[in-house]
Amino acid sequence: MQQARVRLAGTSPEDLDDICADVREIADSTGVALSGPIPLPTKTLEIPSRKSPDGEGTATWEHWEMRVHKRLIDIDADERALRQLMRVQVPNDVSIEIVLED
């Protein structure tokens, strides 16, 4: 049977966990096998910028960062389960990618 690999990425780990709970609920209701969610390493994007706009004075810096959290879920590619998976409400800051594998 084919497997569907679901990759979730977003800046809020709470939103990712909510979506993972929805996917687990879909798998339980349809009776398909599920493995995961597997937490992948968090990627930290950091941008240092000067506080002074004109470049004069002492070199003081601000550091802005954004953390991207990722989760990986493998689920059996049952037609009913995938159809329900496509209807899950996903927040704007979460990206979801579904890939079918043999």
From Swiss-Prot:
Function (record text): Involved in the binding of tRNA to the ribosomes.
Record's keyword annotation contains Nuclease: no
Annotated stretches, region: Disordered: 35-58
Annotated keywords: Ribonucleoprotein, Ribosomal protein
GO biological process, one term: translation
Protein source organism: Halorubrum lacusprofundi (strain ATCC 49239 / DSM 5036 / JCM 8891 / ACAM 34)
Source superkingdom: Archaea
Database matches in SUPFAM superfamilies: Ribosomal protein S10 (SSF54999)
Quaternary structure annotation from Swiss-Prot or TrEMBL: Part of the 30S ribosomal subunit.
NCBIfam families associated with the record: uS10_euk_arch
InterPro entries: Ribosomal_uS10 (IPR001848), Ribosomal_uS10_CS (IPR018268), Ribosomal_uS10_dom (IPR027486), Ribosomal_uS10_dom_sf (IPR036838), Ribosomal_uS10_euk/arc (IPR005729)
UniProt xrefs under PROSITE patterns: RIBOSOMAL_S10
Descriptive protein name: Small ribosomal subunit protein uS10
Gene Ontology CC: small ribosomal subunit
Keyword Ribosomal protein annotated: yes
Single Gene Ontology MF annotation: tRNA binding
Sequence similarity: Belongs to the universal ribosomal protein uS10 family.
Species lineage: Archaea, Methanobacteriati, Methanobacteriota, Stenosarchaea group, Halobacteria
